[in-house]
């Protein structure tokens, strides 16, 4: 129910450390393109909710739905940023990434011992990415 599909930005704020990205929706294909920062390509979200062209919206994305990598991913929902802070909790790492517009987006990953690549650290340039269905579109 509510946990997977929160229906208001107010509610989403209280559900874990959800990322909220503010933007403007434009109908596109199977969902909406969301303009969210100057000179950045739009993000895309699939939803069954109806939004009008040019309507303000919020994208809510849980940190564990966001992938973080040093190489540019092959997906349309990708944002370049810099690691600002890292929080370790048990077997989870939460990366606080500064993205265009001086915003912070949190990405959470499970720590695995078989990480052959160098661990991410502060000030690293990274890419955040997620699937078209990972973000929930909310009205203002």
Residue ranges and their predicted role:
Residues 18-20, 27-140:
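Non-catalytic connector elements of ABC transporters
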């Amino acid at each position: 129910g509510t946990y997977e599909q929160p229906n208001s930005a107010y509610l989403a704020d209280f559900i874990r450390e959800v990322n909220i990205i503010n933007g403007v929706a434009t109908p596109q294909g199977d969902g909406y393109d969301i303009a969210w920062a100057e000179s950045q390509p739009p993000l895309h979200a699939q939803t069954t909710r109806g939004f009008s062209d040019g309507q303000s919206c919020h994208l809510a994305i849980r940190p564990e739905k966001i992938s973080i990598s040093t190489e540019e991913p092959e997906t349309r929902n990708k944002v370049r940023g810099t690691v600002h802070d890292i929080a370790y909790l048990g077997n989870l790492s939460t990366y606080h990434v500064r993205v265009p517009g001086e915003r912070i987006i949190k990405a959470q990953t499970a720590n695995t011992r078989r990480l052959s690549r160098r661990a991410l650290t502060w000030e690293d340039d990274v890419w955040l990415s997620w699937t078209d269905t990972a973000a929930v579109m909310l009205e203002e």
